[in-house]
């Protein structure tokens, strides 16, 4: 394995100055795409994801519709300028196709698709800048965009990542930690229902490390959830003020 250009963890401090249990700065905005039914932008540090939702609308072709529930389709894409890799193709890669499927499966437990028979809901996620944890930032953005679109939901899904760096469990992997760390654990969590909708494990984890990672992920997800809820509330409070006055 290649050595990282800088020490990832030194005296309990990570390369970017964070402690192991600290998220990067989280920024969330809702309603950022004017022509979408719902949209959101989520930043975890330098990683930025934008999600746009269209629907529910009639399924075409009709033979793909389901009589008792709606169909949700998710497309994850990394903008060609999102990474330093100049060879990034605008066409979907195998990884993008895989993550699109992962995101759909992580979102579906939160969506009441039975409310939308013979309909489809399209979710588009674009990574504008990538510095680790892109799939979990995308998951949070997509969940918020669905809520912004007024889709019936059981709960928001918040994505966070936990990893192993020099044998230490850390929250919210940045790009260096993602590339050079010993383990990666992206998770999706519904804070009100206290249920995981996504859990992928990469690397060698002991039982104690895994349990510590789950606890850290829940704390991180609950922190992000508060910011996400405030972003939704602020948007609709501002709309109400415009309609009814202060």
From Swiss-Prot:
Q: What's the main place this protein lives?
A: cytoplasm
Recorded GO terms, molecular function? Answer: 3'-5'-RNA exonuclease activity; RNA binding
Indicate where this protein resides in the cell. Answer: Cytoplasm
Highest taxon of the lineage: Archaea
Q: Name one GO cellular component term.
A: cytoplasmic exosome (RNase complex)
Q: Give the record's keywords alphabetically.
A: Cytoplasm, Exonuclease, Exosome, Hydrolase, Nuclease
Family matches, as Pfam families: RNase_PH, RNase_PH_C
List each coiled-coil range.
none
Q: What is its EC number?
A: 3.1.13.-
Q: Which InterPro entries match?
A: ExoRNase_PH_dom1, ExoRNase_PH_dom2, ExoRNase_PH_dom2_sf, PNPase/RNase_PH_dom_sf, Ribosomal_Su5_D2-typ_SF, RNase_PH, Rrp41
Alphabetical GO biological process terms = gene expression; rRNA catabolic process
Q: How is the subunit organization of this protein annotated in UniProt?
A: Component of the archaeal exosome complex. Forms a hexameric ring-like arrangement composed of 3 Rrp41-Rrp42 heterodimers. The hexameric ring associates with a trimer of Rrp4 and/or Csl4 subunits.
Q: What does this protein do?
A: Catalytic component of the exosome, which is a complex involved in RNA degradation. Has 3'->5' exoribonuclease activity. Can also synthesize heteromeric RNA-tails.
Q: Which PANTHER family match?
A: EXOSOME COMPLEX COMPONENT, EXOSOME COMPLEX COMPONENT RRP41
Q: Which family does the entry's similarity section mention?
A: Belongs to the RNase PH family. Rrp41 subfamily.
This chain belongs to the protein called Exosome complex component Rrp41
Natural source organism: Pyrobaculum aerophilum (strain ATCC 51768 / DSM 7523 / JCM 9630 / CIP 104966 / NBRC 100827 / IM2)
Q: Which gene holds the coding sequence for this protein?
A: rrp41
């Amino acid at each position: 394995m290649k050595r990282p250009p800088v020490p990832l963890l030194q005296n309990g401090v990570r390369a970017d100055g964070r402690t192991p249990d600290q998220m990067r700065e989280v920024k969330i905005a809702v309603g950022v795409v004017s022509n979408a039914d719902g949209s959101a932008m989520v930043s975890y540090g330098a990683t930025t994801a934008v999600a746009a939702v269209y629907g529910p609308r009639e399924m075409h072709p009709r033979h793909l519709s389901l009589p008792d529930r709606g169909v949700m389709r998710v497309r994850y894409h990394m903008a060609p300028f999102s990474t330093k890799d100049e060879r990034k193709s605008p066409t979907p890669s195998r990884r993008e196709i895989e993550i699109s499927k992962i995101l759909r499966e992580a979102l579906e437990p939160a969506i009441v698709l039975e409310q939308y028979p013979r309909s489809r809901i399209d979710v588009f996620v674009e990574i504008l800048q990538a510095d680790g944890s892109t799939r979990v930032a995308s998951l949070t953005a997509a969940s918020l965009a669905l809520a912004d679109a007024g889709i019936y939901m059981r709960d928001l899904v918040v994505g966070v990542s936990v990893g192993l760096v020099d044998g230490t469990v850390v929250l919210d992997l940045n790009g260096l930690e993602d590339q050079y760390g010993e383990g990666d654990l992206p998770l999706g969590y519904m804070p009100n229902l206290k249920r995981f909708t996504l859990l992928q494990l990469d690397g060698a984890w002991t039982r104690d490390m895994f349990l510590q990672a789950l606890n850290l992920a829940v704390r991180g997800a609950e922190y992000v959830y508060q910011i996400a809820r405030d972003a939704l509330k602020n948007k609709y409070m501002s709309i109400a003020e415009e309609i009814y006055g202060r």
